Amino acid sequence: MEFGEEIADKAIELGFEELELGFHTTLEQVKGFKARLDQIPVGSVHAFCPVPISAPQGYPELYQLASLDDDARAIARVHVKKNIEFAADMGADAVVLHAGRVMCRGFFSRWDLKRRVKRGQKLVAAFKRELEQMLPILEKNKVTLGLENLPYLEGFPAEWEVKDLVGDWVKPWLDTGHDFVRRVNQWIDEASKISAEDVRPQTLDLSPIGLHISDSQGGDDHLPPGEGRVDFPALKTFAENARHVVFEPAPNVREDALKKGVEHLKRTWAL
């Protein structure tokens, strides 16, 4: 296990200006990140971070705030609140959340978008009630909740659902690799998807607060930029309007590949 100081030092060496603490971050590593805050700040925290003592390992869907199960929501509520407070303590102003999944008996077929939309309606209502309870905590800590798009059909909220959930302290969080997987599988409702062309003053409330940058070939994600088929030029407007732009490569991505990905993005976005 790398120490927090080592990770922070490597990020500084690679030219990154801020960190996102991921869901694999341990309590021991947090000490190291705190020791480097004067050199590289923490901009965002990915729930659930640090790894809860009760959990065997980090996982972004240990708890699901978007659930029709009362007990599941109650447990998730406690941990999301802790993450909001932890983010504020680290000086971060955003918490990235995998909200939950729209469950059904069996699995959604690849083309079963209509059934997915219908089953999501109840979850939207339940999740909105949870968000209402979170708003005072978010506002008190000056932390925005970022709802990440997920790379599977049952992932919640979907593009057509997130617009009914956002507000001053709740915003979309766009994972570019996940977005590509969803597009390749034709899961995105063309009438309501958030596109670069939609980022106008009257719709900026739907502009993502942050981006997770990764590439994808369609059946995978978290590749370095330039190794997949994500249309990064089309995402430039999103990046310009986002508060946080976070590289999120897979753990097995080598340092030289990561550096090439950074350079690819700099050329693409003329940075």
Residue ranges, per PLM feature:
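A cross-domain feature marking catalytic cores of carbohydrate-active enzymes
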Residues: 1, 21-25, 44-49, 97-99, ...
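N-terminal pre-domain/capping segments
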Residues: 1-82, 88, 142, 170-171, ...
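Short amphipathic alpha-helices and their capping/turn segments at secondary-structure boundaries
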Residues: 23-43, 79-94, 159-165, 188-206, ...
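Aromatic/hydrophobic pocket-lining residues that form the small-molecule binding cavity
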Residues: 4, 76, 80, 127, ...
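Alpha-helix-loop-beta-strand connector modules within alpha/beta enzyme cores
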Residues: 36-51, 127-134, 138, 166, ...
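Acidic/histidine-rich catalytic cores of soluble enzymes
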Residues: 19, 131-229
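Short acidic/polar active-site loop segments enriched in Thr and Asp
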Residues: 17, 93, 209, 243
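Active-site acidic/histidine proton-transfer and metal-coordination neighborhood
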Residues: 65-171
